[in-house]
Amino acid sequence: MKLGYVELADDPRYANRGARSGIVFTDLGRPYQGSQVALEDARAIGRVTGIEFSMERSASKSGDELMQRISDWITSDDIHFVLADLPARALRDLARGLAEHPIMLFNVSAPDDSLRGADCANNVLHTYPSEAMLSDALTQYLVAKGWLQILVLQGPAPEDAAMVASLQRSARKFHAKTVETRPFLLTNDPRNREQTSIALLTGGLRYDVVYVADSSGEFGRYVTYETSLPRPVVGSAGLVPTAWSWSWDRDAAVQLQHRYEKLSPPRRMNGADWAAWAAVKAVTQAVMRSGSIAFDAVKAFLLSDKLTLDTVKGNPGSFRAWDHQLRAPVLLSTADAVIERAPLPQYLHQTNVLDTLGIDAPETACRF
């Protein structure tokens, strides 16, 4: 059973934007090592069952190269399940280009809601949480704490706007309120002081919490302790919703973290690593429990309610039929501690409590 793994060689998401100052604003590690931890488990199982698990990795400069590589894998190497560490547009185009091929792609790093909505594809499964899941998890916690009035500081990037749009949807869903959205800039120009000074950005109104939408990681690190009012900071800084935190210490998480660090020193496991790990674990379970390595049989099991993936976060995971998003808890963490695990117990659902996070079936814009 051979799997594939594709990525862009010059993926801008992994560019070191703080290279001049020597400061790393975001985690630059690619999630490939997460898949290797799960592959070690698969190989151990394979030695008992007689199934050999392996993985081919390809880094290309363009989506067209990736599409050709996967097409070659399908015909020459019998590879039909491929982990994709790609930005949203590249993943969308790849899925469309391979629509007529026997292939299932696993999105292990793109949170964009559009990939689970208008741009969804029947040949993509999402193990990385959607933006909607992340914002729902955080908003559940804010409402539970009684922090209903949210001041939003929004950065200039499209990713920042997407985060804010998702937060606003979550606020409506859980009856919180964004009292105002104020744009900030990353500049030293004194003429833009009102958009660079945290004291000015957070002054002149009342709020319970400050939400920072800063995909760059450069501005948000300064907001905590600099707000005009003494208020908690959440979003891209402070309390952050994430698929994984190295400080999660329940549900056998410590063992997983130690195995990852042994394989990939000195990095610690991040959310995309977890998503890559989960993708390989899902395929392994589907192969073992379906008793087959045939594409149709493994795909059918992955999409069935028989899949009970150990997420190492408590609740077992499965893929939603309406948008192929993996159901999984979301961790709310600081730099060195997990404060809460969502969904919170007071939020209920008629079929699965994990569906309180993200887009539920009646809301979906996905049409396969």
Language model features with spans:
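Extracytosolic ligand-binding ectodomains
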Residues: M1-F368
